[in-house]
């Protein structure tokens, strides 16, 4: 009889792969990763070798304690590697699978998608994440190529190819100072293009100059860096979430899946939220650069958060090191008193540590910059979440909330 698990109490080990490092055909103004190329100026080509690809795939699969293994390919722009690279990766995955089930997901800006790419993704059941920031006016505000030309038209051509070939895809949408002002235009766009799985990523960056040419601040650096102009404000973020939620809860529950709403309901239920930012602890998802360097997190690719290199340490040694364990547990331990006493701690968990550079009303450091927006959102959705939680506990569908709101059996009063 075949065992269904390799270590029943273990968690999967995740390391996201950067096969081209930070190399990209776009130059999005708010990109947090583009400047990471400055960390590797001594490398003439930021391209993962076939030798490293094989070493990583063998070790990554072998380090898993579960029967399912997920590979996540990230950039830079992942499609700047030729299709042959990913075909080779799949051959190696089969070679080293050792009976495990292998899944792949890939994040792309969508501009380089072709029929050939889409056929490959469909035939091999890859999940494709596409970066798109809403309608053309919003998307093209910051997502331009290196010549300063807008990218929306090419992205939509790519999305239409994914649809044509029946590829499973979802959207990663950055919420910034501009598109946050138009939440319903933003949300309705995704419904119009029939995108049923959407992740909102609020952009918050601070500017601190480095000698190597980088200009984005890490959490470990001074807290006084000036906020980047494109950053979404706490008030914008709260209003954005509440406005879209009000539309979604009346019309779209069970039809359109918005990650933050799903994660909020999971936390309301006492389940795992499925996204690191809203979990009590993080640190379970590392990232490996094109040369084998491993970092604590995709948003912490700074020298001070480098765990080592796969040529000198194993993935297990790095991802289960005391240093990485401390990185993950500090998400909770470093919360200020205001957070630990907050009614919505269970739902928020302080969000991502990278955004915790504000001070509380008492002057304590470590408050999330977006706290005010999140608090507004959680306070707003609480009665709806209570209803959906009750439905789930009675083995009923959360989507029943739409009927309850329409027939008046659920009345929300603030």
UniProtKB/Swiss-Prot annotation:
Binding residue positions for [4Fe-4S] cluster 1: 24, 28, 31
Q: Where is the active site?
A: 298
Q: What protein is this chain from?
A: Serine-type anaerobic sulfatase-maturating enzyme
Consequence recorded when altering residue 342 to A = Still contains 4Fe-4S but lacks activity
Binding-site residues for [4Fe-4S] cluster 2, renumbered to this chain: 276, 282, 297, 352
> Which chain positions lie within coiled-coil regions?
none
Q: What is the lineage of its organism?
A: Bacteria, Pseudomonadati, Bacteroidota, Bacteroidia, Bacteroidales
Q: Which domain of life is it from?
A: Bacteria
Query: What keywords would UniProt list here?
Result: 4Fe-4S, Iron, Iron-sulfur, Metal-binding, Oxidoreductase, S-adenosyl-L-methionine
Impact noted for substituting residue 31 to A:
Still contains 4Fe-4S but lacks activity
CC cofactor: [4Fe-4S] cluster
Pathway(s) of this molecule: Protein modification; sulfatase oxidation
Q: Which Gene3D superfamilies match?
A: Aldolase class I
Q: Which Pfam families match?
A: Radical_SAM, SPASM
């Amino acid at each position: 009889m075949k065992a269904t698990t390799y270590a029943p109490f273990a968690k999967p080990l995740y390391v996201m792969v950067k096969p081209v490092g930070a190399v990209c055909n776009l130059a999005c103004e708010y990109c947090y990763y583009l400047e990471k190329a400055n960390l590797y100026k001594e490398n003439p080509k930021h391209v993962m070798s076939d030798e490293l690809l094989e070493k990583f795939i063998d070790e990554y699969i072998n380090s898993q304690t579960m029967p399912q293994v997920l590979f996540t390919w990230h950039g830079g722009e992942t499609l700047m590697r030729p299709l042959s690279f990913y075909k080779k990766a799949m051959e190696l995955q089969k070679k080293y699978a050792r009976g495990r089930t292998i899944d792949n997901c890939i994040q792309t800006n969508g501009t380089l998608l072709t029929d050939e790419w889409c056929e490959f993704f469909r035939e091999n059941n890859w999940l494709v994440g596409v970066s798109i920031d809403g309608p053309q006016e919003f998307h093209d505000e910051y997502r331009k190529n290196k010549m300063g030309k807008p990218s929306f038209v090419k992205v939509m051509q790519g999305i239409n190819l994914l649809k044509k070939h029946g590829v499973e895809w979802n959207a990663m949408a950055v919420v910034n100072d501009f598109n946050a002002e138009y939440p319903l235009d933003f949300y309705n766009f995704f419904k119009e293009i029939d995108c049923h799985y959407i992740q909102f990523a609020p952009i918050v960056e601070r500017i601190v100059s480095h000698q190597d040419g980088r200009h984005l601040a890490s959490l470990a650096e001074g807290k006084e860096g000036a906020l980047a102009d494109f950053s979404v404000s706490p008030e914008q973020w709260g209003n954005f979430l509440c406005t879209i939620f009000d539309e979604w809860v009346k019309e779209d529950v069970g039809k359109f899946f918005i990650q933050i709403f799903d994660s909020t309901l999971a936390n309301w239920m006492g389940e795992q939220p499925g996204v690191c930012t809203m979990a009590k602890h993080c640190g379970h998802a590392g990232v490996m650069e094109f040369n084998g360097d491993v970092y604590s997190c995709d948003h912490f690719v700074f020298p001070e958060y480098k765990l080592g290199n796969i040529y000198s340490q194993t993935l297990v040694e790095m991802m289960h090191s005391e240093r990485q364990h401390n990185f993950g547990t500090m998400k909770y331990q470093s919360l200020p008193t205001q957070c630990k006493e907050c009614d919505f701690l269970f739902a928020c968990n302080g969000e991502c540590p990278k955004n915790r550079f504000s001070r509380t009303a008492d002057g304590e450091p470590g408050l999330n910059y977006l706290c005010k927006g999140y608090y507004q959102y959680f306070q707003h959705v609480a009665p709806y979440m209570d209803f959906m939680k009750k439905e789930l506990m009675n083995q009923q569908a959360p989507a029943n909330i739409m009927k309850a709101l329409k027939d008046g059996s659920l009345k929300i009063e603030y």
